[in-house]
């Protein structure tokens, strides 16, 4: 065998080895992601006495699992002054490979406290929200305040007009939630039309636009 042929064979072997390593690395990454998704379990918190521990505004540093992708949670109460006014509460954290959050707080206020809180929320500089994740104009409840991000989701407050305020949030990335969110929140607490499932139309639209 000539030296030239030996060199050529060596190059072919090297290229093949690199290709195999790339395939193995890709398969390894897919395997890690699959294992992460399969083994990660949602953290479900219903302990209202620890309410502030699960809110981003309780931390000075963004280096915390409760940073919530920088979303503004100031729509929610800074603290719970009257635990007896809490009708329902849940905060869910799930991180198979990217952190996502789902929460709701239902408060039954006195007429005086309701009026004050509703006024605070109506003064909040609400953002546009219609069209993100197929959300339509809210009709189920009156929308008092909303902070919406076209990528990271929603933080908002709703009212039934009878001294009850429902604070809720769905915070995530990559245009979908891996969490089966309908298992953890009453559907009427979601904004009308909300769809963050893995094959939601909004995700398809945004991914197509990013590929152009």
Report residues per predicted region:
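Intrinsically disordered, low-complexity repeat and linker tracts
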Residues: 1, 42-45, 209-212
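N-terminal Sec-pathway targeting helices
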Residues: 1-26
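Residue-identity detector for threonine
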Residues: 2-3, 26, 39, 52, ...
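Intrinsically disordered, low-complexity regulatory segments
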Residues: 9-12, 26-36, 191-194
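Surface-exposed polar/charged interaction patches
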Residues: 17-21, 54, 124
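N-terminal export/targeting and maturation segments
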Residues: 26-113
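Extracytoplasmic electrostatic interaction patches
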Residues: 117-212
């Amino acid at each position: 065998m000539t030296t030239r042929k030996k060199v050529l064979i060596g190059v072919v072997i090297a290229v093949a080895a690199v290709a195999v390593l790339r395939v193995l690395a890709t398969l390894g990454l897919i395997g890690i992601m699959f294992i992460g998704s399969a083994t990660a379990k949602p953290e479900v918190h219903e302990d209202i006495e620890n309410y502030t521990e699960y809110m981003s505004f309780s931390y000075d540093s963004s280096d915390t699992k409760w940073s919530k992708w920088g979303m503004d949670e100031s729509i929610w109460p800074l603290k719970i002054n009257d635990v007896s006014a809490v009708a329902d509460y849940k905060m869910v954290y799930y991180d198979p490979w990217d952190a996502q959050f789902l929460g709701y707080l239902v408060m039954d206020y006195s007429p005086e406290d309701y009026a004050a809180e509703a006024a605070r929320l109506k003064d909040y500089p609400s953002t546009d929200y219609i069209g993100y994740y197929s959300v339509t104009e809210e009709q189920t409840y009156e929308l008092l305040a909303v902070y919406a991000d076209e990528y990271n989701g929603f933080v908002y407050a709703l009212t039934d007009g009878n001294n009850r305020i429902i604070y809720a949030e769905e915070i995530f990335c990559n245009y979908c939630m891996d969490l089966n969110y309908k298992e953890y929140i009453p559907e009427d607490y979601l904004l009308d039309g909300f769809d963050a499932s893995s094959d939601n139309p909004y995700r398809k639209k945004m991914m197509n636009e990013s590929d152009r």
